[in-house]
Each structure stands twice: as C-alpha cells, then as structure tokens.
Amino acid sequence: MASLKEIRAKVTSIKSTQKITRAMQMVAASKMRRAQERMEVGRPYADSMRRVISHLVHASSDYKHPYMVNRPVNKVGYIVITSDRGLAGGLNINLFKALTKSIQQYQDQSVQAEFAVIGAKGVSFFKNFGGKVTSAVTDYGDKPTFEQLNSPVQAMLEDYSNGKIDRIYVVYNKFVNAMTQKPTINQLVPLPDSAFAEEESGIQTELSWDYIYEPDIKTLIDELLGRYIESIVYQAVMENIASEQSSRMVAMKAATDNAGDLINDLQLVYNKLRQAAITREISEIVGGAAAVS
C-alpha cells in the first residue's frame, strides 16, 4: 500500500491536472458559442444561393449541368472533415467508423474510393488506414476562410469533371446540440434531387414573374453551382468546428469530474492510513507506559 507521502503527492498531481482540464472546459465552452454563431451566420448565404440556383434550374429545364446528372458509379470521392487537435472525446473515432462502413459498402460492389482531407486527425488516420488522398488541408484554425478550404473541394470537383470519380460525398460531424454530435455523410455531387426540393413550391408561384438573366442561364448555373458546393463544404467545416468544441467541453468536464472523484477516494484512503498510524502510535505509547510501570 502507498505511503502517506505518496498519496499526498498523487493528490497534488491530480489537483494540478484538474485545474488544466477545468480551464480547457471553459475555453472550449467559449469557443463553442463563437463557432455556433459563425455557423448560424453562414447559413443564409447557402440558403440564398440555393434559392437562386433553383430559379435558374426551373427556368432552364433543357440544360443539365454535369453536377446534376447521375451516372454509373465506378469510383467515389470523399471530402473528409476532421479536427486538427485531439482531446475531443470520441468525435473523430465515431466519424471514422461511419466513413469506413460507407467505404466497405462500396468496396463490396467493387467501387474504388479516393479522399480529400480537411484536418490533421484525418491526415493521420489515412496514413494508417491507407487510401488515395488527393488533397489535404491542416491547421485551418477556428475561423477558416473559403480560400483555406478551397483546394480539397476543387481537387474533387476537377476529378469529377474529368470522369475520374462519379460521386462525391462530404463527411463531417453535424452539430445537433452541446451534448450531441452526429457523424454525417451527405452526397455532394451529383446534387441530390432533395437539394432544391424545399424551394419548388415557392418557385412555381414566383416563376410567373418575367426574369432577365445576364449573361445567360447556362453561364450563371455553371458559375453558381461551384460556389454553392463550396458553401456546403464550408458550412460542414463550421458545423464540425462547433461539434469539436462541444465534444471537447463535455470530455474536459468528464475529466474534471473524474479527477474530483479520484481526489475524494485518495483523500479517504489518506485519512484511513493517517488514523491507523495515529492509533498505532497511541497503542505503542500506552504499551510502553504499561511496561515501565
């Protein structure tokens, strides 16, 4: 059994760690709130872009952009969004489990896969897991820009346009609330029919207006679809950042609480040992006094 000195040293060490985890919990809570705000701010842009594209698509039923045309699937691409840092509970592990399940389903159909990665944890995962990584971005921080995240998106879209891949997915942790983050795999290209389904009812009425499109509908669709896809990926990154901070906050709170429980247990052991030592000393004194008398 450990001595009183060893237990005191262990309690001191755990208290020091507890201070760190409590501080990390508070920092993560603050960052989570800011990430939520940025996540909410980005949504109107994507919604507005979707409405504009819906108008264009319905106004030009004779033109189908390649990003909207389904074709036989021989190879798929995944844009995988992870965190740069750890200490976020099972956030990245749960995402990788969902990803590997999806990959396995395609492999069972003899469909190959390639990957574009955002986040250092994803890069580390694929070094061990294997797989063809065409592009990677790390150290994107808490407030990434479109320019920082653009290369993986463009690499995937270029491969799709060249016929190297036939479907693109975006993989990220969807922020549900502070306690819940959901690993999510959404089809990005070709754009699923549901992408503009919410706009259809309103568009039928609005199309009675006579719109003038400049320079022309085809050019606008070609330009806006790429930006729309970029906005979807950017929004997914913001959701993943909020998920990362909320998961870290929960993990650090659990670590802080566990440290408190461990300190209490050690303190109880310490008190019992100290009481036993005092009792033993008293017994020795009483025994010595009896022997002298």
UniProtKB/Swiss-Prot annotation:
Disulfide bond residue pairs: none
Protein family per UniProt: Belongs to the ATPase gamma chain family.
GO cellular component assignments: plasma membrane; proton-transporting ATP synthase complex
GO biological process, alphabetically ordered: proton motive force-driven plasma membrane ATP synthesis
Gene: atpG
Organism superkingdom: Bacteria
Subunit note: F-type ATPases have 2 components, CF(1) - the catalytic core - and CF(0) - the membrane proton channel. CF(1) has five subunits: alpha(3), beta(3), gamma(1), delta(1), epsilon(1). CF(0) has three main subunits: a, b and c.
Keywords: ATP synthesis, Cell inner membrane, Cell membrane, CF(1), Hydrogen ion transport, Ion transport, Membrane, Transport
PANTHER family in UniProt: ATP SYNTHASE GAMMA CHAIN, ATP SYNTHASE SUBUNIT GAMMA, MITOCHONDRIAL
Membrane topology, record value: Peripheral membrane protein
GO molecular function, one term: ATP binding
Major location category of this protein: membrane
Pfam family, one: ATP-synt
Species of provenance: Psychrobacter arcticus (strain DSM 17307 / VKM B-2377 / 273-4)
Subcellular locations according to the entry: Cell inner membrane
PROSITE patterns per UniProt: ATPASE_GAMMA (PS00153)
Coiled coil location: none
Protein task: Produces ATP from ADP in the presence of a proton gradient across the membrane. The gamma chain is believed to be important in regulating ATPase activity and the flow of protons through the CF(0) complex.
Protein name stated in the entry: ATP synthase gamma chain
